[in-house]
Swiss-Prot record:
EC number(s) stated in the UniProt entry for this protein: 4.2.2.10
InterPro entries: Pec_lyase, Pectin_lyas_fold, Pectin_lyase_fold/virulence, PEL
Reaction(s) catalysed by this chain's protein: Eliminative cleavage of (1->4)-alpha-D-galacturonan methyl ester to give oligosaccharides with 4-deoxy-6-O-methyl-alpha-D-galact-4-enuronosyl groups at their non-reducing ends
Gene3D superfamilies listed in its UniProt record: Single-stranded right-handed beta-helix, Pectin lyase-like
Signal peptide bounds: 1-18
Name of the protein: Pectin lyase
Gene Ontology MF terms: pectate lyase activity; pectin lyase activity
Keyword set, alphabetical order: Lyase, Secreted, Signal
Amino acid sequence: MKFSTFVSLGLTAITALAAPTPSMIDVKRDVVKRAASLEDVATAERPLRCRPSASLPPPSRVTRLPLFSSLVLSRALATTSRSAATSPSSDRTARSCLRTSPSPSRVSRMLSFVTLPSRRSSVAMLSPSRRYELVTPKEITTYLHRLQSENVWVDHLDLSSDRDHDKDYYDGLLDITHAADFVTVTNTFLHDHWKASLIGHSDSNGAEDKGHLTVTYANNYLKNLNSRGRPSASAQATSTTTTTRTCRMVSTPARVRSCLFRTTFLSAPRRLFTRLMLDMLLSLATTSVMARTLPRRVL
C-alpha cells in the first residue's frame, strides 16, 4: 500500500475524531421537538390510571409567563362559574394550580400545560390537585395545602438553577409531596442544583401519605446534584410496586429504571448506599450500553 494511502486514511481518522459530538446544550435545545404530543399519555412502566376525559378543553401551549398567568386565570373563572351553577355541593376536581411570584395564586380546572415559562427571573410552579372547592379566586388560596394530585405526567423537562448559592437558597427542583399518586416522570434532565427530586416531604405527615406516592421514574438524566439525587422520601408510604427495578431505600413505591446518575452525591447511610450500589451494578450488568447511549437519547 502506498504512503499516500496511509496519509489519506490517517487524515480521515483525524477528521472523524475531531467531528463535534452531540452535547447537552444541543440536547437541551431539542427538548420541545422530542417531547410527547398533546394527545399522548404516559406508558412508562405503568400507564396513568385514567386518560383525559373527552369533555376537557383542548390543551394550550404557552411560552411566556404573562400569557400563562392570564390563561390560567381566565379558565379558573370560567370553571368556577360553571361548577357553582351545576353542582354547588359536589366534590369538584381542580386539575392544576399555578403560583407565580409576585403574582397571587391561581387555580384552574381542566387545563393542560405543555411548555412552561423558562424565565429564571420568575418562579412558575404547577401543583395539580384534585380536591378544591372552587368559589372565587380570592378564596381559592385558602385551599392551597390540600395537594392530593394524581394522574400527573412530567415529560421532557430541563430543570436546573445554579450551584453558586448554599444548599438552602433553593428548594427542590421536582418534589412530589402531599399524598400525590400515580405520577410519572420521564425523559427529564435534572442538573446543577443542590436538592434535586424528593418524594414525600416530612415524617410528620405519614398518615396523609400512607398508601399514596406511587411514582415512576424512567429515562431521566441527573447530573451535578448534591442531594436528593435519587427518589428519596421520609413519608410513611406503603410499597405496592411490582416492577422490575424498585428503589428500596425508603418505603415509597418509586420505580427507578434506565436513569443515569453522573457527578451526583448520594446522602444516605452506608448500609442503604451499599444496597443502592448493588442494585445499580445489577442494572448496568444487564444493560451494559446504557451509559454510552442514554445521554443522547434521554431528551
